[in-house]
Structure formats: structure tokens, C-alpha cells
């Protein structure tokens, strides 16, 4: 029986998130700044969010594929 990627990936992501606290803090700081800008519709934190996702993905990738082989 094959292991589902979704069942394996979730717990690995949660474990990897603790190693990406710096990028998460940067995203939260940006989010706080953007929330204060009431009239600036172009302001967003997409860059910081993508950096956080990339950090988690770099950690998850090797661990996930090792389990799915």
C-alpha cells in the first residue's frame, strides 16, 4: 500500500516551520505595517510570504521524498 503525500507532508511541514521563524517574523512585521496603510491598495507582503514558503519547502523536500520512495 502506498503512502499518501498529504498524510506525510503535513507533519513534516509543521516540524519545518519552527526552523523558519525568521521568515515568519518578517512576514508578520510586514503584515502589521501594511495593515496600518489604510489607503495604499498596492502594498502587500507577497515577497515575505513567498520567502517563508520557500524556507519550509527547502526543509520539507528531502524529508518528504525520502519517505515516499
Swiss-Prot record:
Signal peptide: none annotated. It is found in: Mitochondrion inner membrane. The keyword Transmembrane helix does not apply. Its main location: mitochondrion. Keywords: Disulfide bond, Electron transport, Membrane, Mitochondrion, Mitochondrion inner membrane, Respiratory chain, Transport. It holds the Pfam family UCR_hinge. One of its GO terms (biological process) is mitochondrial electron transport, ubiquinol to cytochrome c. It is a peripheral membrane protein. Disulfide bonds join 16-59, 30-45. InterPro entries: Cyt_b-c1_6 (IPR003422), Ubol_cytC_Rdtase_hinge_dom (IPR023184), Ubol_cytC_Rdtase_hinge_dom_sf (IPR036811). One of its GO terms (cellular component) is respiratory chain complex III. It comes from the Eukaryota. Component of the ubiquinol-cytochrome c oxidoreductase, a multisubunit transmembrane complex that is part of the mitochondrial electron transport chain which drives oxidative phosphorylation. Belongs to the UQCRH/QCR6 family. Component of the ubiquinol-cytochrome c oxidoreductase (cytochrome b-c1 complex, complex III, CIII), a multisubunit enzyme composed of 3 respiratory subunits cytochrome b, cytochrome c1 and Rieske protein, 2 core protein subunits, and additional low-molecular weight protein subunits. The complex exists as an obligatory dimer and forms supercomplexes (SCs) in the inner mitochondrial membrane with cytochrome c oxidase (complex IV, CIV). This is Probable cytochrome b-c1 complex subunit 6.
Amino acid at each position: 500500500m502506498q503512502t499518501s503525500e498529504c498524510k506525510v507532508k503535513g507533519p513534516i511541514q509543521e516540524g519545518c516551520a519552527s526552523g523558519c521563524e525568521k521568515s515568519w517574523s518578517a512576514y508578520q512585521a510586514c503584515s502589521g505595517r501594511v495593515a496600518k496603510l489604510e489607503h495604499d491598495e498596492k502594498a502587500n507582503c507577497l515577497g515575505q510570504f513567498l520567502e517563508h514558503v520557500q524556507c519550509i519547502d527547502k526543509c520539507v523536500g528531502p524529508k518528504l521524498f525520502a519517505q515516499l520512495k
